[in-house]
């Protein structure tokens, strides 16, 4: 029983570590605008799949970690991720029962709103510029959502994480 518990938490943590690595991985300059929001995708999956284990607290801690890694103002990503994941966690039953293609469309919207909120918070704190390329990254996240969802669901079921 203890081994399964450790394996389950190791699985969740390893997905977040992989998401951080993918977020930090360098992309060619021409494709930088297509970079998906890996951390948001992984966090969104876990909030939809097991909202009783991964929810607002995890979102806040991951946001703080992301702020520390990026060197941005401490709490910006934590605030935006925790508030947006709160809304998603409140509506997880509705969102979970939507078709995968409709979830992809909502992921585009969620990622764009999260990036816009991060911009607005940073703009209120100091000078920040909004890049229209954030829209393309949101579309890339939406295109990747079905594959991310299916892969993570397969691994979650194999580990018997519910």
Swiss-Prot record:
Gene field: mreD
Entry membrane topology: Multi-pass membrane protein
Known role: Involved in formation of the rod shape of the cell. May also contribute to regulation of formation of penicillin-binding proteins.
Compartment(s) of residence: Cell inner membrane
GO biological process per UniProt: regulation of cell shape
TM stretches of this protein: 5-25, 30-50, 56-76, 105-125, 132-152
The entry's keywords: Cell inner membrane, Cell membrane, Cell shape, Membrane, Transmembrane, Transmembrane helix
GO cellular component, one term: plasma membrane
Upper classification of the organism: Bacteria, Pseudomonadati, Pseudomonadota, Gammaproteobacteria, Pasteurellales
Major location (coarse): membrane
A Pfam family annotated for this UniProt entry: MreD
Protein name: Rod shape-determining protein MreD
UniProt-listed InterPro entries: Cell_shape_determining_MreD, MreD_proteobac
Keyword Lipid metabolism: no
């Amino acid at each position: 029983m203890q081994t399964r518990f450790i394996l389950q938490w190791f699985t969740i943590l390893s997905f977040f570590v992989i998401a951080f690595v993918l977020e930090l991985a360098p992309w060619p300059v021409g494709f930088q605008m297509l970079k998906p929001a890996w951390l948001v995708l992984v966090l969104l999956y876990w909030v939809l799949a097991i909202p009783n284990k991964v929810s607002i607290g995890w979102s806040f801690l991951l946001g703080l970690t992301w702020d520390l890694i990026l060197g941005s103002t401490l709490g910006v990503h934590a605030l935006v991720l925790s508030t947006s994941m709160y809304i998603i966690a409140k509506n997880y039953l509705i969102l979970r029962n939507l078709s995968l293609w409709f979830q992809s469309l909502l992921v585009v919207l969620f990622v764009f709103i999260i990036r816009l909120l991060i911009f607005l918070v940073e703009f209120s704190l100091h000078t920040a510029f909004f890049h229209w390329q954030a829209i393309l990254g949101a579309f890339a996240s939406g295109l990747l959502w079905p594959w991310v969802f299916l892969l993570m669901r397969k691994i979650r079921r194999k580990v018997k994480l519910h």
